[in-house]
Every structure is written in C-alpha cells, then in structure tokens.
Design a protein with these regions (language model features):
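A residue-level marker of the well-folded mature domains of exported/periplasmic proteins
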Residues: 5, 24-195
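Residue-level signal for mature regions of secreted extracellular proteins and peptides
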Residues: 17-18
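Bacterial N-terminal signal peptides that target proteins for export
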Residues: 2-11
Length: 195
C-alpha cells in the first residue's frame, strides 16, 4: 500500500472514530429530563410504577393507565414495569422524584419497605397515589391516597361462597380437599384475602 493510500485510510478511520465519539457524547447531553415533555405542552407528568404484568388483569390495568394518562387527556406518562421486584419499583420512584414528576402512582409489590422512598417523595413535594395493593408504613401522610379493594372482604366472600357451594352439594368436612392460591407473598392482596 502506498503512503497516500495509507494516509487516506487513516483519515477515514479517524473521521469514523470522531463521528462515533461525537454521537456518543456531549453535544446533546442525555439527562434524566430527556423523557420529559417540552414545558410549553403544559402536560401533567405522571410517573407510574406497575408491579409487573403477571396476569390478564394486570395487563388490562396497565392498558387502562396508558389510555387514561394520555397526551389527549392532558397527561404525559412515564411508565415503569418493575418485573415483580421491589428494588425496581424503589429505583423507578426515585427516578420519578429526580425528574420532578407532578404525581407518582404505583401498585406496590409487597406491603413493607416503603417508608424511606415515600419520605423522599414527600420531601420533594410530589403526591403519591397507591393503587390496587396498599403499603404498611409508620406515617400514612407519606401518601396522598390509596385506591383499592377491601381484600379481607374478598377473602371472606370467597370463603362463604365455597362453603355454600359445598353445602349445596352435600359434601361433609372429611370429603373436601382445598388448595388455596395466594398470589404474591407479603402483598396486601394476599394478606387480606387469607386473614
């Protein structure tokens, strides 16, 4: 290879390298705010941490949230799927706090372990709405509202239904074997329905 061809190849390689480094760096810094809508859109920013997508009900719940918190309805949705891990939800909530969302909405995977991150949201002045399942915290002022079911009543109703059903079929106590599917351990739904 002659000298001019080597210089040409080196020049091309340097240009490609320069383009790669430029594309990966500083001209448009990637900050946590990049997910946020432009301020002139005047949208309410909602950070939602869904516990996962383990069932058709949860998928329908997620779809409902996406439809409700749409741009057409005046919202900008930041959505996170925690994949059944509390640490993922805590990380998402902290990300929402750092992005200064207007509201945080989440369905907690488990009942305990939320005091610290909810205190952080409260200190940041961000209202927290808990949906479906609830949390067990020392200070209920750490969240604004809980939207959910009476899980204990659901469990009682299911037990009464089963008792009536078996009685109607004339089963005796020694003829029945029952398997109870409880769901996520330590979730308010599981705790309430099995009390």
């Amino acid at each position: 290879m002659n000298v001019s061809r080597k210089k040409y190849c080196l020049a091309v390689l340097f240009m490609i390298a320069a383009l790669l480094f430029t594309a990966c760096s500083g001209t448009d810094l990637q900050t946590e705010k990049t997910n946020m809508p432009p301020e002139d859109e005047n949208l309410i920013v909602i950070g939602v941490s869904q516990l996962g997508s383990e069932s058709m009900w949860r998928t329908a719940n997620t779809n409902s949230l996406r439809e409700t918190f749409s741009r057409d309805n005046g919202y900008f949705l930041l959505f996170d799927n925690a994949r059944q891990k509390q640490e993922n939800q805590i990380k998402a909530i902290r990300s929402f706090i750092s992005q200064r969302v207007d509201y945080i909405v989440f369905s907690p995977i488990v009942e305990d372990g939320w005091d610290t991150v909810l205190e952080e949201a409260k200190e940041a002045g961000i209202p927290v709405i808990i949906m479906d399942r609830n949390v067990n915290v020392d200070d209920d002022s750490l969240y604004t509202a809980w939207i959910g079911s009476n899980f204990e009543k659901e469990g009682e109703d299911a037990g009464r239904w089963l008792e009536d059903e078996l009685r109607g079929k004339k089963f005796s106590d020694d003829q029945v074997n029952i398997v109870v599917l409880q769901g996520t351990a330590n979730s308010t739904a599981m705790i309430g329905r099995t009390e």
